Amino acid sequence: MTTFGTPLSPHATKVMLLGSGELGKEVLIALQRLGVETIAVDRYENAPGQQVAHHARTITMSDPAQLKALIEQEKPDLVVPEIEAIATGMLEELEAAGTVRVIPTARAARLTMDREGIRRLAAETLALPTSPYVFCDSLEELQTAIDSKIGYPCVVKPVMSSSGKGQSKIALPKDVAPAWDHAMAGGRVSRGRVIVEGFVDFEYEITLLTVRALGADGQVETHFCEPIGHLQVSGDYVESWQPHPMRPAALEKSHEIARAVTDNLSGQGVFGVELFVKGDEVWFSEVSPRPHDTGMVTLCTQWQNEFELHARAILGLPVDTALKSPGASAVIYGGVDAAGIVFDGVADALRVPNTDIRLFGKPESFVKRRMGVALAFDADVDVARTHARLAASKVRPRAAG
């Protein structure tokens, strides 16, 4: 796109986001700053992104008929999936018919909607290094896979889930049945199927934000952000920092793996490529064809954060992945199960040097639901991490009243 219309006019450039959580909210804001008319879609009303979009729509996005009807009604120029639980088959059908352009592509949305599609692409089609794995449809198959191939310890994850839900570590035979039950409770849509992975002896894991954007000649170019280190607990991100130091050879291999995966998925936009690293060895873990939760740190570290990069790339605009300052992020959890919570300690959090916070505006809190994030920058990334954790600890969510 080189010409942009005026929002809420007959010539508006319209973008529809499928999924309107905290990441989608930031993408919507970035799009609006470029004069784009936005449509925020989610499965529940008053989702964070719906609070800032021009239009808010609530449907079951995994229902093909509902999804098709909404796209045909709104007639967006671009459809941007921000979550996995979407009727991707319908997106492929509409894209093939020329009804809409899907970001990055409908095929990429389908392959990355669950762990099976993308793992088979990476390991079997592209021959990239990954952990050993088996897909299982029952507790019996899971036990057989562990006994015959994977061994202990191992990790079990639902084929489809988000933010670490349903993921657990199996150390001993007695852990297998509880892990299966936990995966069934935490999975989305593809209930009854899991991936069991052998442990990779890695030193650290990173997210490599990889951006496919048009160059001056109109051809797609690949750009890399500085590697993002992150800490996960039970598969859920709790802290991230940028840059994470890496050996030159490991960084080069990371670029090669990320380029191979994103070239195959094709299209334009930001891809969050997760990798395990030990010394100069690198293993592919997962990829999301959209901004990544660990990439929220870029709100304080890059001249163009991951959401601005995504907005620019999908609109065909130039991007800049340069680092502005080292920095860190730390998650603010809900801490309570309640609707319409309030937050104490915000002023105290912002008194921590070089910090900022984002409160997501989710209408309902759960004990382990991400309700906000603290950000901090500093020339020393370890200082930034300390400040981000401190700021996050000072924000105290509670039930209202």
From Swiss-Prot:
Every ATP-grasp domain range: 120-315
Nucleotide-binding recorded as keyword: yes
Gene Ontology terms: cellular component: cytosol
One Gene Ontology molecular-function label: magnesium ion binding
Record: residues binding ATP: 115, 157, 162-167, 197-200, 205
EC number: 6.3.1.21
Binding-site list for Mg(2+): 274, 286
Catalytic activity of the protein: N(1)-(5-phospho-beta-D-ribosyl)glycinamide + formate + ATP = N(2)-formyl-N(1)-(5-phospho-beta-D-ribosyl)glycinamide + ADP + phosphate + H(+)
PROSITE patterns: ATP_GRASP
GO biological processes: 'de novo' IMP biosynthetic process
Positions with a binding annotation for N(1)-(5-phospho-beta-D-ribosyl)glycinamide: 22-23, 82, 293, 362, 369-370
SUPFAM superfamilies xref list: Glutathione synthetase ATP-binding domain-like (SSF56059), PreATP-grasp domain (SSF52440), Rudiment single hybrid motif (SSF51246)
Pfam family, one: PurT_C
Plastid recorded as keyword: no
UniProt family annotation: Belongs to the PurK/PurT family.
PANTHER family: FORMATE-DEPENDENT PHOSPHORIBOSYLGLYCINAMIDE FORMYLTRANSFERASE (PTHR43055:SF1)
Annotated protein name in UniProt: Formate-dependent phosphoribosylglycinamide formyltransferase
Naturally occurring in which organism (per UniProt): Polaromonas naphthalenivorans (strain CJ2)
High-level lineage: Bacteria, Pseudomonadati, Pseudomonadota, Betaproteobacteria, Burkholderiales
